[in-house]
């Protein structure tokens, strides 16, 4: 992972970000994954932060729904995305 502008960006997403393709399902899942990882590390330190825990559950649900949509529409892109983001298949 590279650090760019205060955000972590995977190499394969840099190209898409430059093209302003922020509405794609892949970019949205990538963005949610970064937020989820950041919140998870926050919750390891602050175990009683229940509002952040709720936010994490909401983000997980949004990402799950987007992944289900992508898996239904294009299985190849779905498999590629989950392998690049290193998230397990659901």
Curated annotation (Swiss-Prot):
UniProt GO cellular component terms: chloroplast; ribonucleoprotein complex; ribosome
This protein's record includes keyword Ion transport: no
Stretches of the chain forming a coiled coil according to its record: none
Keywords: Chloroplast, Plastid, Ribonucleoprotein, Ribosomal protein
Localization in the cell: Plastid, Chloroplast
Claim: Chloroplast is one of the keywords in the record: yes
SUPFAM superfamilies: S15/NS1 RNA-binding domain (SSF47060)
Listed GO MF terms: structural constituent of ribosome
Superkingdom as given in the UniProt entry: Eukaryota
InterPro entries linked to this entry: Ribosomal_uS15, Ribosomal_uS15_bac-type, uS15_NS1_RNA-bd_sf
CDD domains assigned to the protein according to its UniProt record, in alphabetical order: Ribosomal_S15p_S13e
GO biological process entries: translation
Subunit and partners: Part of the 30S ribosomal subunit.
Stated family: Belongs to the universal ribosomal protein uS15 family.
NCBIfam families (UniProt xref): S15_bact
Name assigned to this protein: Small ribosomal subunit protein uS15c
